[in-house]
Structures are given as C-alpha cells and as structure tokens.
C-alpha cells in the first residue's frame, strides 16, 4: 500500500480488455501513467494480444487470463518482459488479493463476483463497474466492503452521478433516486417491430460507446433494471424511492431528489472516462481530456416515462427487489442465458424478458443470499432452468 504523498498509487484492473478496462487504462495514461501509478495486475479473457499489449504498455507486474486454455499464449506473448502470466479462476482471485490501493472491478458477469469480493475483503478502494456484485450478492458485497475498510465508488455513469449529487450527511433527506435512461435504439419502436430485432441492430447505442453485452442490455433496458437493484444497495434506499426516467440525450446522467423539493443532477457529455477518472481520484477531481458540455449547443433536453410493457425488465427489477432474497441473482443469471440465446439466433429479442420472468417465478421460494455458495447455487440453477426454456421455445418455433 502507498505511504507518503509522493508514493505511487498501486492499482489492479479486473477486466482490462473490456470497454471499461480500456477506458480505465486511457485515464491512467492521461493522469501520469507509470510515473504516477504502479499496476499490480490486469486481467482479461480471450483477447490475449490486447491483454499482453496492455501489460507491456502500463508496466503491469502480472497479467491474468480467465481462460486456462490461453495460458501458454499469454506466457509466450509476455516472454522476456519480466511480466508474470497466470490463468484460470483461482488466478483471478489471487490477482484480486494482491495488496492494492484501488481496484477497478470491470469483469462482466458473475465471473467478476469472487475476485471483486476478494478485493473488497482485502481493504482496497473498489471502483465498481461489475453489476452482478450488487445485483446478485448486494448485502454480502456491501458488508465485505465495510469489513475490509475500503471505499466503494460506483463507475456506472448513472450511479456515479448519484454519488456526486448526494450531499454529505444528508442521506436522511433523500426522497428519491432518479436514474436516467437513453431509451436505447428502440425507444420509439412498437412491440411488433421489436419482435424482429436482430443482435446487430440491438448493439447500436445512440449515445454511448460500450461493449456488446452492455449495448444489448441497454436496448432491452435490462441494464437499467440491474442499475435499479444496484442503486438500492449502493445508496441504502427503498425500492419505492427508485425512479427511472427516459432522457434520450444522455446529458443528465442521473439525479437525487431531496425532501425539501430540491433536485440535484450531474451533467456531462456521454464519456465513461469522466466517471472512471472521478472514481480514480476521489475525493479530488483532476483534468481529463474529454469533450466539454456546451450548453449553447443543447437545443433541448427531453424526458419521458419508460414504457414497461415494451421494456418489462424494469418491472422485473421491482419484482426482484420486493421479493428480495436471491431473486436478483436469479433474474441476472436467467437473463444472461437468454442474452446468449438471442445473440445465437435461438430466441427473439422480446423473449429474453419472458425467460427471465418465468425462471424468477419458478424459483420464488429459493432461499436467501447469506453466503456466496447460496448465490452461486441459485445462479447455476437459474441458468439451467433458463436453458431448458430456451430449448423449449427453440423447438416450438
């Protein structure tokens, strides 16, 4: 860990090859790179060329691929550099356990749960971009952060906005959390049109540059559904205090409403590097090379209520929060299976929500999220059931 004002901060990036990870390395480079930071470890999955290139560029001590079959390729790519290579699930957890001041948790999906939880237990400040930590194991994760003594700083643009708009010592005065949503590429489409959506069409986000999974999650509004559950755990609010408003321009990233009628909002151009930079330098702010918001060029800012008939994921999030227990983990796992089935052309776009809801209803009596074993068991069973439903629909088509 760092000591002294001039010591380099020690960082770990879990998920460096994804969209968030790449933007994180860009921010680190802007803020001084090797002169200001020591990179303890970076991790990726199948993109070995990019992972090795990143490790060399940032001077990481360790590079880890989650795919054990790619270990030799990574080792060969790093030969002669002095950078250690490792592979597999246990290697991810070991990378997360390396003492660091700050950990970017950007591994997508439930694969990020165990390593992020380990980093939290070790006392690092966690810049959280992985949704599943809070959606599937919110109480466990928040408790691990508290026990570890680190800080939890959200990186999602919406949660970062809320984090910034929350006034110190005014939690008691928070009346509502207002998450904004662009509405995605199908905001004005009918259900009939959405039934014929292809993965390529769903991938096109109108405002943000993001990865494939997140882009399709934005199109279905499942991302927003997960963010609702995250907000409940991050900001210790009741489900009924969480609102979603569609804001097509994505200029207002989210808002906090207070009991005196005031609403505080965080605005900016849609660029993930702003939220990443804030998380990296919190509680300070620093100069970043990102586009500045020009109010004179904003012709209008529009807002509308979300249509939960066309976008039922929002309703499912409320159901999961009301039921509690493992419903968040179940919803997330079932949606992941449905997502892959949609991408593979096995089911339609609208069927993703149908499958998630069906599995949630089937597993309504499943226990509580008291342990990671319980979370993983529910996740595994939800995936199995979702797979069965996908196969049934595919056969009936």
Swiss-Prot record:
Residues binding Mn(2+), per UniProt: 156, 158, 227
Any one Gene Ontology molecular-function term assigned to this protein's record: manganese ion binding
Domain of life: Bacteria
Pathway this chain belongs to: Isoprenoid biosynthesis; isopentenyl diphosphate biosynthesis via DXP pathway; isopentenyl diphosphate from 1-deoxy-D-xylulose 5-phosphate: step 1/6
Binding-site list for 1-deoxy-D-xylulose 5-phosphate: 131, 157-158, 182, 205, 218, 223-224, 227
Cofactor: Mg(2+); Mn(2+)
GO biological process: isopentenyl diphosphate biosynthetic process, methylerythritol 4-phosphate pathway involved in terpenoid biosynthetic process
Entry EC no(s): 1.1.1.267
Major enzyme class: oxidoreductase
UniProt keyword annotations, A-Z: Isoprene biosynthesis, Manganese, Metal-binding, NADP, Oxidoreductase
Catalytically driven reaction(s): 2-C-methyl-D-erythritol 4-phosphate + NADP(+) = 1-deoxy-D-xylulose 5-phosphate + NADPH + H(+)
InterPro entries linked to this entry: DXP_reductoisomerase, DXP_reductoisomerase_C, DXP_reductoisomerase_N, DXPR_C, DXPR_C_sf, NAD(P)-bd_dom_sf
Gene3D superfamilies: 1.10.1740.10, NAD(P)-binding Rossmann-like Domain
Binding site for NADPH: 17-20, 47, 130, 132, 211
Coiled coil: none
Task performed by this protein: Catalyzes the NADPH-dependent rearrangement and reduction of 1-deoxy-D-xylulose-5-phosphate (DXP) to 2-C-methyl-D-erythritol 4-phosphate (MEP).
Family classification: Belongs to the DXR family.
Name assigned to this protein: 1-deoxy-D-xylulose 5-phosphate reductoisomerase
Organism of derivation: Rhizobium rhizogenes (strain K84 / ATCC BAA-868) (Agrobacterium radiobacter)
Name of the encoding gene: dxr
